[in-house]
């Protein structure tokens, strides 16, 4: 039977830690029997890694792929707990710890190409071996290096229009006007926008789709140290409104959704940056009877400050809603 029964890391459940904040927790070590000369410690680790395959240059063999990758170390701190008289009796022992997160950290992130992760790991060792360890991952929200106060106070709008053909010889047009009171938000905040749709065709418009996209540009290097970049997009949020706009009519749809509580901030310049992120709200009207769509795109800026995070909505609010006017 192992001398160590269990080792646990105790932290507030589902906590989101801002860069620059303090992590307070406990390590709980439970022993089956007396342990002599133990080492009990806890580590805070944050690192990022990206990797993808791409074809090598024009003059070379396209049948071969090259691996592009990059990594960054953001934080690595260790606390070793003092052990009185260098032994621990059987039973449970609790060790308190706290770590200060560095003020400049990227947010927790995960995709098929890259990840940025943070974790606290507790370890119990004797003179030669690791007897037990436990790792607990953290949610960390990065802080913006810049503030977008002027942008956040300005309304933004975009308009799209398309001429369409239907029923062989009929023609018309559909216009879409999307307006937001601002385009700068913090994670967890509610995003509200208005879509005005004008249907100058003889057909019904049934649905309108709203989606928030994250566009990420990764930076890596080949084995020969050549710099490479890779762009990728992912859909963070999606909702659909049953507009049902009659022929030659118009309507206004007011929509809202809550942003995720942890998001990469819109890219500024930062050391050890292995990826840059931008965001876009896309409103799409599907016109299946003409095999076409009308799309409006609005850039969204994500910032994060201590003041902004204190004011944003929490999980108990509705994630999204929409209604017609």
UniProtKB/Swiss-Prot annotation:
<keyword id="KW-0744">Spermatogenesis</keyword>
<protein>
    <recommendedName>
        <fullName>Arrestin domain-containing protein 5</fullName>
    </recommendedName>
</protein>
<dbReference type="Pfam" id="PF00339">
    <property type="entry name" value="Arrestin_N"/>
</dbReference>
<dbReference type="InterPro" id="IPR014756">
    <property type="entry name" value="Ig_E-set"/>
</dbReference>
<dbReference type="InterPro" id="IPR011021">
    <property type="entry name" value="Arrestin-like_N"/>
</dbReference>
<dbReference type="GO" id="GO:0030154">
    <property type="term" value="P:cell differentiation"/>
</dbReference>
<dbReference type="Pfam" id="PF02752">
    <property type="entry name" value="Arrestin_C"/>
</dbReference>
<comment type="function">
    <text>Plays an essential role in spermatogenesis. May be involved in the anchoring of the sperm head to the tail during spermatogenesis by affecting SEC22A-mediated SUN5 and NDC1 transport and localization.</text>
</comment>
<dbReference type="InterPro" id="IPR011022">
    <property type="entry name" value="Arrestin_C-like"/>
</dbReference>
<dbReference type="InterPro" id="IPR014752">
    <property type="entry name" value="Arrestin-like_C"/>
</dbReference>
<dbReference type="GO" id="GO:0016020">
    <property type="term" value="C:membrane"/>
</dbReference>
<dbReference type="InterPro" id="IPR050357">
    <property type="entry name" value="Arrestin_domain-protein"/>
</dbReference>
<keyword id="KW-0221">Differentiation</keyword>
<keyword id="KW-0472">Membrane</keyword>
<dbReference type="GO" id="GO:0007283">
    <property type="term" value="P:spermatogenesis"/>
</dbReference>
<comment type="similarity">
    <text>Belongs to the arrestin family.</text>
</comment>
């Amino acid at each position: 039977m192992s001398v160590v029964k269990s080792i646990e890391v105790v932290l507030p459940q589902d906590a989101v830690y801002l860069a620059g904040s303090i992590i307070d927790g406990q390590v709980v070590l439970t022993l089956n029997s007396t342990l002599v000369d133990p080492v009990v410690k806890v580590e805070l680790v944050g690192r990022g890694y990206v990797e993808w395959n791409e074809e090598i240059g024009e003059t070379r063999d396209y049948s071969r792929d090259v691996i592009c990758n990059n990594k960054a170390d953001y934080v690595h701190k260790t606390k070793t707990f003092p052990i009185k008289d260098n032994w621990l009796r059987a039973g449970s022992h609790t060790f308190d710890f706290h770590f200060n997160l560095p003020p400049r950290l990227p947010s927790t992130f995960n995709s098929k190409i890259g990840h940025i992760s943070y974790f606290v790991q507790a370890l119990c060792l004797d003179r030669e071996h690791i007897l037990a360890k436990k790792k607990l991952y953290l949610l960390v929200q990065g802080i913006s290096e810049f503030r977008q106060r002027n942008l956040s106070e300005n309304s933004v709008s975009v308009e799209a229009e398309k001429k369409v053909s239907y029923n062989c010889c009929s023609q018309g047009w559909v216009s879409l006007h999307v307006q937001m009171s601002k385009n700068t938000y913090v994670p967890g905040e509610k995003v509200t926008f208005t879509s005005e749709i004008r249907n100058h065709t003889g057909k019904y418009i049934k649905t309108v789709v709203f989606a928030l996209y994250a566009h990420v540009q990764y930076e890596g290097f080949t084995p020969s140290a050549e710099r490479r970049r890779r762009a990728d997009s992912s859909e963070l949020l999606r909702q659909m409104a049953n507009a049902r706009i009659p022929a030659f009519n118009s309507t206004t749809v007011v929509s809202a959704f809550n942003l995720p509580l942890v998001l990469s901030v819109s890219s500024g310049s930062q050391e050890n940056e292995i990826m840059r992120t931008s965001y876009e709200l896309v409103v799409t009207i599907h016109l299946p009877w003409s095999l076409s769509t009308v799309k409006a795109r609005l850039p969204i800026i994500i910032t994060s400050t201590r003041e902004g995070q204190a004011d944003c909505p929490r999980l108990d609010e509705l994630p999204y809603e929409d209604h017609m006017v």
